[in-house]
């Protein structure tokens, strides 16, 4: 087959896909590509457009149901709008809830009054939202965020810590860099290593690299770490009395990937399957407390264009929704 014939076949394939697309969405497609800096090859354009249109229709129908009072949150065709579910799931990492958690220190709840609203951002404990990119490093961002909060409470200084340090250097503890990892093993590394560098001295690259940790540049240390028992009440107490807590959740669903704002509740979410690490930075409720619209405030690592400027309100008090309390851990400094 000659080059000219092959090119003609390729062009014909792209033309057929383009012709099947909805022309009324042309301007929205071009604007979306500009907004998220998307550039495709001639072969990719049609396939990505088809996926994007499917997601666009899903989002519009969901938001109609939100306007009708059938949903509690809205969705948006964000940077993941051209991804299939299979492609997005490759960005997640299966995180088995370890059997050894019973042998490790378990947070002992402190009795007493708990505030109805907590938001550690307002107390200066939380660094800006970051973007993990295509590296499966959510576990590193979650662990670093928990340490940042504790270091701030101890020193009064908020220092962004190096997630790349964790990606590159915690393999001996059992993490696998950009392939997969866990917050527990990340904290174990910092504890054994007796230090973690700052983002300023060990910046994030979003790819696997050789460990370049220098003890003299350490910006944080931890003395131990503890799990929170598998209970939303205990997690609530830990968030209120200790600070931002690292947790794992089930984030496999399109509704999570394309979340925009509101209190996220996904009936298909599992409380036993954990595949994404985030940081709980607070909790509260919308409307009247008696309305039952309670939420966890979580910080994600998909950039500020995802969700509520990088954050999500996830349903609280709904039977450990999405496993929010199944894998909660925090450091001591």
From Swiss-Prot:
SUPFAM superfamilies the record matches: Cysteine proteinases (SSF54001)
Signal peptide residue numbers: 1-20
Pfam hit, one: Inhibitor_I29
Subcellular localization: Secreted; Lysosome; Endosome
One function term, GO molecular function aspect: cysteine-type peptidase activity
PANTHER family attached to this UniProt entry: CYSTEINE PROTEASE FAMILY C1-RELATED
Protein name as catalogued: Cathepsin 8
Species: Mus musculus
